[in-house]
Amino acid sequence: MDDNKKKALAAALGQIERQFGKGAVMRMGDHDRQAIPAISTGSLGLDIALGIGGLPKGRIVEIYGPESSGKTTLTLSVIAQAQKMGATCAFVDAEHALDPEYAGKLGVNVDDLLVSQPDTGEQALEITDMLVRSNAIDVIVVDSVAALVPKAEIEGEMGDMHVGLQARLMSQALRKITGNIKNANCLVIFINQIRMKIGVMFGSPETTTGGNALKFYASVRLDIRRTGAVKEGDEVVGSETRVKVVKNKVAPPFRQAEFQILYGKGIYLNGEMIDLGVLHGFVEKSGAWYAYNGSKIGQGKANSAKFLADNPDIAATLEKQIRDKLLTAAPDVKAAANREPVDEMEEVDTDI
C-alpha cells in the first residue's frame, strides 16, 4: 500500500474510532486468534464430527428432525454437560412439554435450570433476548420454533389465514438478538420440526418451519434421525440415532455421527467410546473380548461399556486419547465460512 493510501486509511480509522469507539474496526493480525470455545453435546462422536469438540459458544445452533428422533434429548444432554462446567442454563419451553423427571435422569440439575413456558412467540423470543442481554446465561434452548405462535394467530379465529407471520417474527427476532448472543458468548439452540413441501418433483420435499431466516443465522445446523431400535431380547430399550452436520461455519461440514440413545438414560457414551476406541486402535478387539492397555475389560460391548462406567478414571483417559487424536488438527474456519452454499436437506453419507 502506498503512502497516500496509508494516510487515507489512518484518517478513516481515526474518524471511525472517534465516532463509534475504540475497537469498532480492528486489524486481525494485531490480536492472537483464539480457539472458539465449545460445549460438549454428551456424544463423543458428535463432538468430533462438529470439529471443535462440541457446539460453539456465542453462536446460534438449529437442531431439526422428525418426531421422536431425539432432538430434546440431545439439547438436555448439552445442558447437562454445560452444568458440569458450572454454566447457567435456561430452557424456553414453548411446547409446554418439558418433563423435569426425564431431564433429571439425563443428568440435568433441574433445581438450577431456568424454565419459561411463554404464551406467545413474541413473549418467548423477548424472554430469550432479555436472558441473553443479562450476560449471565451460558446456554439457552428454545423448544421449538414450530411452537412460537404469533400473538395475532392466538387471538384470531381458528380458520384465519396468517401468511408468513411466523417467518417475519423469526426474521425480526434473529436480527435483533444475533449481536447480543455474540457479545454475551451465549449458546442459543433452536429446536425445529420438519414439514413437507407440496408438489416437489425433484430433491427432498422436507423443509423446516419458521421461514429461511434461521437457516442463515445459524452457525451450526444438525439433522437428527432415528435409524433403528436398540433391543435387549425382545424388549426395545433405546434407539439408534444418526446426526448429520448439514451446516457448520466453525469447521468443515457434512460429517456425521451415529450413537445410541437409551430410554431413561440418554446418550450411550460408554458404548461410543468402545466403538471409537476399536476404530482408532486404542481398544483391542479379539473375538468377543475387548482389551485396553493390554488388559481385558469385558466380553461383548455391553460388558466392556459397563467396565468403563464402573471405572470413570479409565473412561476419562480413553476419552481424552480419542479427543486428542481426532481433534488435534485445527479446522480451516475461513474455508468453512466461505464455502459455497448447498442444499442442506440433501442426504450426505460421510462417516467420521
From Swiss-Prot:
BP-aspect Gene Ontology terms: DNA recombination; DNA repair; SOS response
Keywords: ATP-binding, Cytoplasm, DNA damage, DNA recombination, DNA repair, DNA-binding, Nucleotide-binding, SOS response
Residues noted as binding ATP in the record, renumbered to the chain: 65-72
Pfam families (UniProt xref): RecA, RecA_C
Subcellular location: Cytoplasm
GO cellular component term of the entry, any: cytosol
Coiled coil: none
GO terms of molecular function: ATP binding; ATP hydrolysis activity; ATP-dependent DNA damage sensor activity; damaged DNA binding; single-stranded DNA binding
Domain of life assignment: Bacteria
Keyword DNA-binding: yes
Keyword DNA-binding in record: yes
InterPro entries associated with the record: AAA+_ATPase (IPR003593), DNA_recomb/repair_RecA (IPR013765), DNA_recomb/repair_RecA_CS (IPR020584), P-loop_NTPase (IPR027417), RecA-like_C (IPR049261), RecA-like_N (IPR049428), RecA_ATP-bd (IPR020588), RecA_C_sf (IPR023400)
Function: Can catalyze the hydrolysis of ATP in the presence of single-stranded DNA, the ATP-dependent uptake of single-stranded DNA by duplex DNA, and the ATP-dependent hybridization of homologous single-stranded DNAs. It interacts with LexA causing its activation and leading to its autocatalytic cleavage. Plays a functional role in the DNA rearrangement associated with the phenotypic switching from a pathogenic smooth to a nonpathogenic rough form in this bacterium.
PANTHER family found in the cross-reference section: MITOCHONDRIAL DNA REPAIR PROTEIN RECA HOMOLOG-RELATED (PTHR45900:SF1), RECA (PTHR45900)
Family, similarity comment: Belongs to the RecA family.
Name of the molecule in the record: Protein RecA
Taxonomic source organism: Pseudomonas tolaasii
